[in-house]
């Protein structure tokens, strides 16, 4: 809902208010509304030109809306980085200047599709998941959460909208929750 998006935006912007430059990433960007709202909230504390936007979206028609919506809101196109791909299958964003080539950002925000099926096969060594465990094939909620965590800087912030089931489901999800708590 729009109200949740606005709340997330204000929380993220306040957390980042003392930074001169920030990078924000939405791995399930849809039309880009979360990024737009965060950019608007963050611009209370910093120049709009000091914000870099990273967006990834699986659906091609929605992916096209992301960049268009960001540009239509007056965001400098050179600060927009978008990709049409499957977030869980192909890790992005990357930084080829670093090793490993993962891009860490100041904020990751997302509203992924709830309890979507995914393919965990062959991902045991994927650094996004290997430390905490693999989400069950029938529910990718924790796969999205772990992807998001993997991309934040140590002093960064993450906000994500997930179904309440992630708080109490058993099996693999319980093990991931336990690992997240134990590893702080």
PLM features: residue spans?
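Conserved catalytic-core motifs of eukaryotic protein kinase domains, centered on the activation segment
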Residues: 120
């Amino acid at each position: 809902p729009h109200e949740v998006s606005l709340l997330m935006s204000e929380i993220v912007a306040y957390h980042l208010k003392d930074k001169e430059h920030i990078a924000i990433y939405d791995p399930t960007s849809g039309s880009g509304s979360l990024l737009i709202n965060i950019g608007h909230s963050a611009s209370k504390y910093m120049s709009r030109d000091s914000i870099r936007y990273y967006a990834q979206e699986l659906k091609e028609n929605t992916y096209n809306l992301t960049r268009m919506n960001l540009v239509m809101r007056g965001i400098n196109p050179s600060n927009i980085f978008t990709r049409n791909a499957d977030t869980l299958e192909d890790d992005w964003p990357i930084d080829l200047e670093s090793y490993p080539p993962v891009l860490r950002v100041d904020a990751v925000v997302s509203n992924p599709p709830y309890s979507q099926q995914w393919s965990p096969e062959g991902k045991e060594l994927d650094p996004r998941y290997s430390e905490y465990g693999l989400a069950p094939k029938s529910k990718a909620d924790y796969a999205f959460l772990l992807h998001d965590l993997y991309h934040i800087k140590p002093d960064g912030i993450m906000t994500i909208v997930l179904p309440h089931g992630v708080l109490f489901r058993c099996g693999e999800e319980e093990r991931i929750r336990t690992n997240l708590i134990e590893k702080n």
